[in-house]
């Protein structure tokens, strides 16, 4: 079953986080009444607090019903010596490649690109850099720059914003 691998991948993309951090999530990371994830990122030990959308929240509730008897949100589906443990990064990659192949997706897809894709999509949507940083855990704008890609969508957004401001200026009467 690839269910838990799928959940790890979905959470990484949804929240723009590293696969390694998602595979290690425990139930204590989820604040159910606030629909919020608390995460201390492994790379720099930065804390992020992320909202849990309705669809993902429903998935996590179902996951809790099925796997709530142990610590990890998405452990390996078979216990190792009677204990449920997180997937290794190697196994996440191996099983994800199987899913990619079974789904008929391009083999060059890489899980490590999910975080960069999420950050690029936030930028393309016009999300201010400080808000992107609150999701990604970066502490300065320069560290986010490598994720910011010059895409048609972001150029289109920028020019449309500029043009809408010109229209506003024309419609504003001066004294």
Where are these regions (language model features)?
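C-terminal secondary-structure termini that scaffold catalytic or DNA-interacting sites
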Residues: 78-81, 161-175
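Conserved tyrosine-mediated DNA breakage-rejoining catalytic core shared by Y-recombinases
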Residues: 15-20, 24-65
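Short basic/aromatic active-site micro-motif
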Residues: 4, 106-126
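C-terminal catalytic core of Y-nucleophile DNA break-rejoin enzymes
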Residues: 42-62, 70-97
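Basic, Lys/Arg- and aromatic-enriched nucleic-acid-binding interface segment
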Residues: 1-19, 23, 115
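Short, polar N-cap/turn motifs at the start of nucleic acid-interacting alpha helices
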Residues: 29-34, 106, 127-148, 170-174
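Catalytic-site neighborhood detector that most strongly recognizes the C-terminal catalytic loop/helix
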Residues: 41-45, 136-161
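Short alpha-helical segment immediately N-terminal to, or the first helix within
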Residues: 11-12, 25, 121-122, 135, ...
């Amino acid at each position: 079953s690839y269910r838990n691998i799928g959940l790890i991948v979905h959470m990484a993309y949804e929240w723009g986080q590293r696969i390694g951090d998602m595979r290690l999530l425990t139930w204590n990371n989820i604040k159910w009444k606030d629909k919020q994830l608390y995460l201390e990122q492994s790379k720099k030990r930065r804390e992020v607090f992320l909202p849990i959308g309705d669809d993902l929240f429903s998935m996590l509730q179902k996951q809790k019903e099925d796997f709530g008897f142990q610590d990890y949100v998405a452990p390996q589906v078979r216990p190792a010596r009677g204990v449920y443990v997180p997937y290794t990064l190697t196994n996440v990659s191996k099983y994800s490649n199987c899913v990619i192949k079974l789904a008929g997706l391009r083999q060059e897809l890489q899980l490590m690109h999910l975080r960069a894709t999420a950050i690029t999509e936030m930028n393309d949507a016009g999300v201010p850099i400080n808000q992107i940083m609150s999701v990604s855990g970066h502490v300065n704008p320069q560290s986010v720059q490598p994720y910011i890609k010059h895409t048609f969508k972001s150029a289109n957004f920028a020019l449309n914003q500029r043009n809408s401001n010109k229209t506003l200026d024309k419609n504003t009467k001066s004294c």
